[in-house]
Amino acid sequence: MAAARSCNGYARREGPPSPKLGTEKPRVSAGSGGSGDGWRGERPRSEEDNELSLPSLAAAYTTILRALGEDPERQGLLKTPWRAATAMQFFTKGYQETIADVLNDAIFDEDHDEMVIVKNIDMFSLCEHHLVPFVGKVHIGYLPNKQVLGLSKLARIVEIYSRRLQVQERLTKQIAIAITEALQPAGVGVVIEATHMCMVMRGVQKMNSKTATSTMLGVFREDPKTREEFLTLIRS
């Protein structure tokens, strides 16, 4: 069972066209789960915030255990609230980082004008509806416009946005917009294929279901041949 919702086997997300030189860059809209101020936005959470909020977060897990009918004082659960609290802070550590942190020294002038693709980037995130994981692969391609990005930084972009409370559709779009804002390329394509534990462990309980989403910007959206080349290469 696949939850793909589109042509070419992938769900297409509507998004703004790729910016051209001299035009205003697109921004991640407020309330979209991003920084609210594009790829240079402020961190919504700091290390100090983590330290200050850890006791209340652990106390919340203690309350959850009691509400489930468990005894937080029994041996196996004595440290569970603190373990769960620190784990949740790690699962959402993307709130402590911005794209500017990793991209400022990794954008290089380069005349390469053919497609750049990094595929099968491992992704782990938390569904914001049920707070259970969804995991999968991210495939990214872009057509440079005089600038390229260090390849490992594409994986870092995925890490920053996936380590937050997310929905897959928004995550796909945020990755594409971040690359577009940073490089102003001729186009960007992002495809995510993921398994959602909220569909596996609860609800319809379909073990083999996968959801595929995509965001195509610039020539990847406007030119069917460019889009098809990208989709063919990530499938190969």
Curated annotation (Swiss-Prot):
One of its GO terms (biological process) is positive regulation of nitric oxide biosynthetic process. Gene3D superfamilies: 1.10.286.10, 3.30.1130.10. Residues 1-52 are annotated as: Disordered. GTP shows a positive allosteric effect, and tetrahydrobiopterin inhibits the enzyme activity. Zinc is required for catalytic activity. Inhibited by Mg(2+). It is found in: Cytoplasm; Nucleus. The keyword Ion transport does not apply. InterPro entries: GTP-CH-I_C/QueF, GTP-CH-I_N, GTP_CycHdrlase_I, GTP_CycHdrlase_I_CS, GTP_CycHdrlase_I_dom. It catalyses: GTP + H2O = 7,8-dihydroneopterin 3'-triphosphate + formate + H(+). Disulfide bonds: none annotated. Pathway: Cofactor biosynthesis; 7,8-dihydroneopterin triphosphate biosynthesis; 7,8-dihydroneopterin triphosphate from GTP: step 1/1. NCBIfam families: folE, PRK09347.1-2, PRK09347.1-3. Belongs to the GTP cyclohydrolase I family. May positively regulate nitric oxide synthesis in endothelial cells. May be involved in dopamine synthesis. May modify pain sensitivity and persistence. HAMAP family: FolE. This is GTP cyclohydrolase 1. It comes from Gallus gallus.
